[in-house]
């Protein structure tokens, strides 16, 4: 499983998602992730909206194996359901 987290500096939900991904990387085989700072990379909400397929107003925006799954709360729920791991 490969997760990409699009976030920005100062975003507490981005930090939570990144921390959970780091925890999963250490505990789940074949799990890896990439954190993308949208400000540093010059990515706009419009760019993210195109990737997600609907308007994006918040970050983080999280993709699992290239499929958009939503934000931090969605990611936490999926990881708890799939692996029993919580942030």
Curated annotation (Swiss-Prot):
An example Gene Ontology molecular-function term: electron transfer activity
Keyword terms: Cytoplasm, Disulfide bond, Electron transport, Redox-active center, Transport
Biological process, per Gene Ontology: cell redox homeostasis; cellular response to oxidative stress
InterPro entries the UniProt entry points to: GLR_AS, Glutaredoxin, Glutaredoxin_subgr, GRXA, Thioredoxin-like_sf
GO cellular component, one term: cytoplasm
Residue ranges occupied by any Glutaredoxin domain in the UniProt entry: 1-87
Family the entry assigns: Belongs to the glutaredoxin family.
Role according to the record: Has a glutathione-disulfide oxidoreductase activity in the presence of NADPH and glutathione reductase. Reduces low molecular weight disulfides and proteins.
Subunit: Monomer.
Entry protein name: Glutaredoxin
